[in-house]
Design a protein with these regions (language model features):
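Conserved glycine-rich cofactor-binding loop
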Residues: 12-13
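Rossmann-fold cofactor-recognition segment
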Residues: 47-65
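Substrate-binding pocket helix/loop in short-chain dehydrogenase/reductase
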Residues: 95-108
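Active-site helix of classical SDR
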Residues: 119, 156
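C-terminal helical subdomain
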Residues: 173, 180, 195-232
């Protein structure tokens, strides 16, 4: 099934922007949301010739009351919605108990509470129309609790994965599909400064993500190589080894 009308959050930069460009190249209609409306307006202008239709809406996903309003407005602008990609996220974080609780709380509020608010809004639409595809962008970091500055981030993404798994169990056999995507290291602003041999170039990473989304598999590590075997290994490796991998 082709999902022609797609909402993407966190679409002003990084993987969200990359997915918007890739889906636009496939002729899809896009509802793009992010905090930086100026960047969304500029992106929409660039995509106008390829995409079926592009509508934008400023949205801070931590404003949980505004999320359903934003989704309703975007769906109206698109003439409906077939897929929602819950992508908006934050990579801040600090070692727990070091006086930087605000950064960790903001990370969890954005990545997990914001994702829940988006899932609520998307699922309300999908339940009403009895079809749709909810895509939750998690992370390889969700597979294993990570130390230091990544502790809150990995916990927030583990929550996103668990949310997706719960919905999959509930919706099994229904016309509403749920996919959980776990990206590894892909070149974006959030990963700038990370030194690893496992980094994937942006365009290749985005293509892998879009291919996984289009497949509508329940769970996809992307790119599959090397992240699928790494994800499997992370569940069993000693802490010292897993921390070095991711």
């Amino acid at each position: 099934m082709t999902r022609d009308k797609i909402i993407i959050t966190g679409a002003s930069s990084g993987l969200g922007e990359g997915m918007a460009r890739e889906f636009a190249a496939r002729g899809r209609s896009l509802g793009l949301a992010a905090r930086r409306i100026d960047k969304l307006d500029a992106l929409a202008a660039q995509l106008a010739d390829d995409a079926g239709r592009v509508v934008v809406r400023a949205l801070d996903v931590t404003d949980t009351d505004d999320v359903p309003r934003a989704f309703a407005e975007l769906a109206e602008g698109l003439g409906g919605v077939d897929r929602v990609i819950v992508n908006a996220g934050l990579g801040k974080g600090a070692p727990i108990g070091t006086g930087n609780a605000a950064a960790n709380l903001e990370t969890v509020q954005t990545n997990l509470v914001g994702a829940l608010a988006q899932a609520e809004a998307a699922m309300a639409i999908f339940r009403a129309q009895n079809h749709g595809h909810l895509v939750l962008i998690s992370s390889i970091s969700a597979v294993r609790g990570l130390p230091k500055a990544q502790a809150a981030y990995s916990a927030s993404k583990a929550g996103v994965s668990a949310l997706g798994q719960g919905l999959q169990a509930e919706l099994a056999g229904s016309p509403i599909k749920v996919s959980v995507i776990l990206p590894g290291y892909i070149e974006t602003d959030i990963n700038r400064g990370v030194k690893t041999k496992l980094m994937t170039e942006t365009d290749a990473g985005v293509r892998a993500m879009v291919a996984a989304i289009e497949s509508e598999r329940r769970r996809s590590e992307v790119p599959a190589w090397p992240w699928k075997p790494i994800a499997a290994a992370l569940r069993h490796l000693p802490d010292a080894v897993s921390a070095k991998l991711i």
